[in-house]
């Protein structure tokens, strides 16, 4: 099975298809001080048409601080990309649910190895 979008897919559908199979995406946020586009690879969970992100250093993560100022980002996966609206949340039960989704996808040991703080998560919604 190819990870490339099909020719007749809309850009949004192509991105959704890649998100359903991928392990890493690139996000591009706007720097809160510089105003410049900043891109970074991140892990994610795509479930029920929802894209969940978990900042590796929780609320201390720079890209997270940037989306607090401008709650949108560009998401790219293997040649498909799109703008998403970002909804950060701090509710402990919701954050814990996202952490569990990450553990299920990437393994508890890798999540423990790479993620140091679990006080925030982000829901990114396609526009």
Give residue ranges: language-model regions:
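Extreme N-terminal tail/first-helix region
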Residues: 1-24
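Short, structured beta-strand-loop surface elements
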Residues: 3-5, 58-127
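Generic signal for short, ordered secondary-structure residues
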Residues: 13-14, 46, 77, 81
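Covalent nucleotidyltransferase core used to form phosphodiester bonds in nucleic acids
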Residues: 15-17, 52-65
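Extracellular/periplasmic catalytic domains that process cell-envelope and extracellular macromolecules
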Residues: 19, 45, 115
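Short beta-strand segments
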Residues: 22-56, 73
